[in-house]
């Protein structure tokens, strides 16, 4: 595989911020006890993922489906792509033209795709949203009055902010791929030329 193009690792974390604050009370209750509390803030740029096509067939002939990197068409190329109506249990979900327009809007709303029209997406090109997490650590220490050791009870709350508001501390880790486009069918003519049809996925 030495000829493969270099790309970002799936596990690449471009940026990380970590802040910790802690406080321990003086001993109280006749020097039998003390209490410690720690607050840990952890933030990092999101997980990397690839833009691919959701294939119902082996689109690129590598023996696998669902792993073909997305070609991001120019406006003129998009106008020539063969979209088809999308159905769910015989009910029309989206017409071919609606699918084309939805894909065009998706391209304009994705920073990477918008700036790489006319190219194939590179592996792990995109980053999900930043993730923020606040963890709480509480420790209650009981001292032996004769100085023969101590007993400590701890209590941890992981992702404390998410307990207060479900929109805080959200984990955006994605699967390895995001597929805004499905290859609905792939026909091959007598000359071996493949002609795909497409419909749009509701990619986030």
Regions found by a protein language model. Give the residues of each.
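Gram-negative outer-membrane beta-barrel transporters
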Residues: 1-47
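Outer-membrane beta-barrel proteins
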Residues: 30, 44-51, 162-167
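A structural signal for well-ordered alpha-helical segments within the folded catalytic domains
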Residues: 12-19, 23, 132-136, 149, ...
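Short conserved catalytic/interaction loops centered on acidic-Pro-aromatic/His motifs
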Residues: 147-151, 164-173
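Extracytoplasmic gating/loop element in the C-terminal half of outer-membrane beta-barrel translocons
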Residues: 36-145, 152, 174-203
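Gly/Thr-rich phosphate-binding loop signature of adenosyl cofactor/nucleotide-binding cores
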Residues: 157-159
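Short, solvent-exposed loop/turn segments that connect beta-strands within catalytic domains
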Residues: 29-31, 146-149
């Amino acid at each position: 595989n030495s000829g493969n193009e270099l790309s970002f690792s799936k596990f690449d974390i471009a940026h990380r911020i970590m802040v910790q604050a802690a406080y321990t009370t003086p001993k109280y209750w006749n020097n039998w006890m003390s209490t410690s509390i720690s607050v840990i803030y952890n933030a990092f740029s999101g997980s990397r993922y690839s833009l691919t096509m959701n294939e119902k067939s082996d689109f690129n002939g590598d023996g696998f489906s669902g792993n073909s990197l997305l070609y991001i068409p120019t406006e003129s190329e998009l106008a020539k792509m063969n979209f088809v109506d999308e159905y769910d249990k015989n009910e029309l979900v989206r017409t071919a033209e609606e699918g084309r327009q939805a894909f065009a809007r998706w391209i304009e709303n994705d920073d990477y795709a918008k700036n790489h029209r006319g190219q194939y997406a590179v592996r792990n090109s995109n980053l999900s949203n930043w993730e923020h997490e606040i963890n709480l650590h509480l420790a209650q220490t009981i001292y032996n009055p004769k100085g023969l050791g101590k007993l400590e009870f701890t209590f941890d709350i992981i992702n404390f902010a998410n307990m207060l508001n479900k929109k805080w501390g959200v984990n955006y880790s994605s699967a390895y791929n995001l597929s805004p486009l499905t290859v609905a069918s792939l026909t091959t003519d007598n000359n071996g030329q493949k002609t795909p049809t497409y419909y749009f996925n509701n990619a986030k």
